[in-house]
Amino acid sequence: MVVGLGCENNQPDVFREFLGEFDEDRVKFMVTQKVGDEYEEGMEILRDLYAKASKDERTDVPLSELRVGLKCGGSDGFSGITANPLLGMFSDFLIAQGGTSVLTEVPEMFGAETILMNRCKNEELFEQTVHLINDFKEYFLSHGEPVGENPSPGNKAGGISTLEEKALGCTQKCGKSYVSGVMPYGERLQKKGLNLLSAPGNDLVAATTLAASGCHMVLFTTGRGTPFGTFVPTMKISTNSTLAKNKPGWIDFNAGVIVENEPMEKTCERFIDYIIKVASGEFVNNEKKGYREIAIFKTGVTL
């Protein structure tokens, strides 16, 4: 259900044009200024939508159709040792099955971008990756922000000392696969395999962008912890066991066992099984607690 006030610039009729083709029985609109009791009207619309959705049946879908977003936040000294390499191993596995993974938070790539450039499938993708990086650097400079204004205080407290160290951890999340696509902010996924997506490092903005691109879930590694979630399952993978123990309501999977003598391969097997369960409907913590938010990357004038 799409709800509008009725006097804003983004009118429902204009919004509909950008949606393209959609099922009129499954997408409904309500303009609150045009109805009497918006609560009752909204509940009636939701009851109608539920009646149709309740007839849906689950069907088997191969892993080749799964699309995941790769993100990190509140990184620490273990990020590049445990959780990020785990995501990289999973990403390579998923892509080998014909699936798709998406890496974003471009400013976090500064200092390790040549690793991604060297893995582009062709010259066109190489040039697009160069533009992806340089475009964000120019954005920083245009606002007087130092390109190297990273790592954050939390990163430093967790043991990360330089931007390059943080960037090397960031790029590990996408494994060793070749880059098959580069997308500007707001674009929907078109290619399978590893895609690079333009978005800032801000957790909620980046996660929203990944979900909007068509990712079914966001895999989020963290060493410091965060409870947030966007409108798709936002799975938190801890880099250390202490965080997983202290924040069971935040963390969904503990990668800290990798430094406690569990082989990476065994951890990845358990991780794959868990992701399949979540893709099949099992809730992660942000869903259980109702943490579902979005944030839009804005620049320029706000009226």
Where are these predicted regions, by residue range?
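Metallocofactor- and cofactor-centric catalytic cores in central/energy metabolism, strongly enriched
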Residues: 1-217, 224-303
